[in-house]
Swiss-Prot record:
The gene is TMEM196. InterPro entries: TMEM196 (IPR037661). One of its GO terms (biological process) is negative regulation of cell growth. Keywords: Cytoplasm, Membrane, Transmembrane, Transmembrane helix, Tumor suppressor. This is Transmembrane protein 196. The chain crosses the membrane at residues 11-31, 47-67, 73-93, 106-126. It comes from Homo sapiens.
Length: 178
């Protein structure tokens, strides 16, 4: 069983990886798109690395935010960003696969973009899984704290009743005892 610290550490590493992939994908996509504009009329997949890079970048930023603030809303936001990153990466790969020709001068850039998309898809998948683990851990922790708090307040109520009985206060019957 992983501890919360291990999950958060892994989430931070994956988030930094996603930010790096996002920046790299945007850079490769921008170069690829500018070269595609010079060579031929732009096609649908020429700018897809930029958009998937933006999705990966947002996923990484939200992952760091999620690791710092472990609230439910931030975890939901991060999960949504991971899903957007998955969709962006898959669409990027599909568009580039349709556009890429091995004889094209853009082939190495398209291959690099597809590789970045595959790594980004894997990172988003792992990040989603880690977020679910973190949410489960936080839910158990909050339940345990609430249970401890209720037990503590029950003990305090019993103590108050016994103090009143020993101080000559009104006698109360509690669980069949005077």
């Amino acid at each position: 069983m992983c501890t919360s610290g291990q999950i958060i550490g892994s989430l931070l590493v994956l988030s930094v990886l996603e930010i790096g992939l996002g920046v790299s994908s945007v850079a490769v996509g921008a170069v690829s798109f500018s070269l595609a504009l010079r060579e031929h009329k732009p096609q649908l997949g020429d700018s897809s690395p930029v958009w998937s890079g933006v999705c990966f970048l947002l996923c990484g930023i939200c992952g760091i935010l999620c690791a710092k603030k472990k609230s439910g809303l931030v975890m939901i936001l991060f999960s949504a960003c991971c899903i957007c990153g998955l969709i962006g990466g898959i669409l990027n790969f599909q568009f580039l696969r349709a556009v890429t020709k091995k004889t094209s001068s853009l082939y190495p850039l398209h291959l690099a973009s597809m590789s970045l998309a595959c790594i980004g898809i894997g990172g988003c998948t792992l990040s989603s899984w880690l977020t679910c683990r973190l949410a489960s851990y936080e839910q158990r922790r909050m339940f345990s704290e609430r249970e401890h708090s209720l037990h503590h307040s029950h003990e305090m109520a019993e103590k108050e009743i016994t103090d009143n009985m020993s101080n000559g206060g009104p006698q109360l019957i509690f669980n069949g005892r005077v």
